[in-house]
Swiss-Prot record:
Function: Catalyzes the reversible oxidation of malate to oxaloacetate.
The keyword Membrane appears for this protein: no
Amino-acid positions noted as binding NAD(+) in the UniProt annotation, renumbered to this chain: 11-16, 35, 97, 120-122
EC numbers, comma separated: 1.1.1.37
UniProt-annotated catalytic positions: 177
UniProt protein name: Malate dehydrogenase
GO molecular function, one term: L-malate dehydrogenase (NAD+) activity
Organism encoding this protein: Rickettsia conorii (strain ATCC VR-613 / Malish 7)
Record: residues binding substrate: 84, 90, 122, 153
Keyword Oxidoreductase: yes
Organism superkingdom: Bacteria
Catalyzed reaction equations: (S)-malate + NAD(+) = oxaloacetate + NADH + H(+)
Family: Belongs to the LDH/MDH superfamily. MDH type 3 family.
Length: 314
């Protein structure tokens, strides 16, 4: 009988718990749910295993406060870190979460150096960079969850605008995971037809698409403003699962993720959202799109924002 993959989730908050539930339902592998708060991962693991019995899932879930339990993990998803609170500057958040990420990275290096690592913790582009540098893992095995989520938001808003199924929509969002992200209408399609062509047919307008692009950029902020006490977790978790499944099943899907660039798009030693192919070796290749001068200018501005954030931790 084939042994299940071992998947460790670092952080047992809303995203961590949702990840565990989705992994269990899809039976992607056995789960280690880690958190520094005693009782929380153990309680959630028990609750999730009991939910699994109803769904017919035989996946094992272990809650723990001991990093040693992640030993030999095939894949690790990291959500540990503080959310940004009212009155907290971006710099404060970077400082606190960098400290947390360094601790996580040291333990990943010690116990699971062969794992494929997906980082979700914000500020994403900085945290995934810290994970790479502190863990010493190869760059093709460390990626950040960003573009899949941003594209899912863009997809939804486009589906609503054109009154079609989300299954008909494919969109592309590049750049940093923040306000300066670059949703690309030219590379986004409805059943293979590019958005600019649909505008020419009179099915939408440039003004409407620009509004959708702005709403996509503020997608996370819109949810934070509505929830008041937290941030999105269902869609971020579902996005990470898409990436995880492509790795575990060698699906070779092309997904937009924060990837470590080494000259692609003219970017060196930074994590930026670009389309990549994910398979059993991790990142198999970076897909380099041909950008117009205007798109490249927006992309470069987004990269500059990431660069400035990285400078704050050096």
């Amino acid at each position: 009988m084939k042994q299940n993959a071992k998947i460790s989730l670092i952080g047992s908050g809303n995203i961590g718990g949702t990840l565990a539930h989705l992994i269990s339902l899809r039976e992607l592998g056995d789960i280690v749910l880690f958190d520094v708060t005693e009782g929380v991962p153990q309680g959630k693991a028990l609750d999730l295993m009991q939910a699994g019995t109803i769904a017919g899932s035989d996946i094992k879930i272990k809650g723990t406060n001991d990093y040693k339990d992640i030993e030999g993990s095939d894949a690790i998803i990291i959500t540990a870190g503080l959310p940004r609170k009212p009155g907290m500057s971006r710099e404060d958040l970077i400082s606190i979460n960098t400290g947390i990420m360094k601790t996580v990275a040291a333990n990943v290096k010690k116990y699971a150096p062969d794992a494929f690592v997906i980082v979700i913790t914000n500020p994403l582009d900085v945290m995934v960079y810290v994970m790479l540098k502190e863990s010493g893992l190869p760059h093709n095995k460390v990626i950040g969850m960003a573009g899949v989520l941003d594209s899912s938001r863009f997809n939804l808003f486009l589906a609503e605008e054109f009154k079609v199924s989300v299954n008909n929509v494919n969109s592309m969002v590049l750049g940093g995971h923040g306000d300066a992200m670059v949703p690309l209408a030219r590379y986004s399609t409805i059943s293979g037809v590019p958005i600019p062509d649909l505008i020419k047919m009179g099915l939408s307008s440039n003004e409407n698409i620009e509004k959708i692009i702005d709403r996509t950029r503020n997608g996370g902020g819109e949810i934070v403003a509505l929830l008041k006490t937290g941030s999105a977790y269902y869609a971020p978790a579902a996005s990470a699962i898409e990436m995880l499944e492509s790795y575990l099943k060698d699906k070779r899907q092309i997904l937009t993720c924060a990837a470590h660039l080494q000259g692609e798009y003219g970017v060196h030693d930074l994590y930026v959202g670009v389309p990549i192919m994910i398979g059993k070796e991790g990142v198999l290749r970076v897909i380099e799109l041909q950008l117009t001068a205007e798109e490249k200018a927006l992309f470069d501005k987004s990269v500059e924002g990431v660069k400035k954030l990285i400078e704050t931790i050096k």
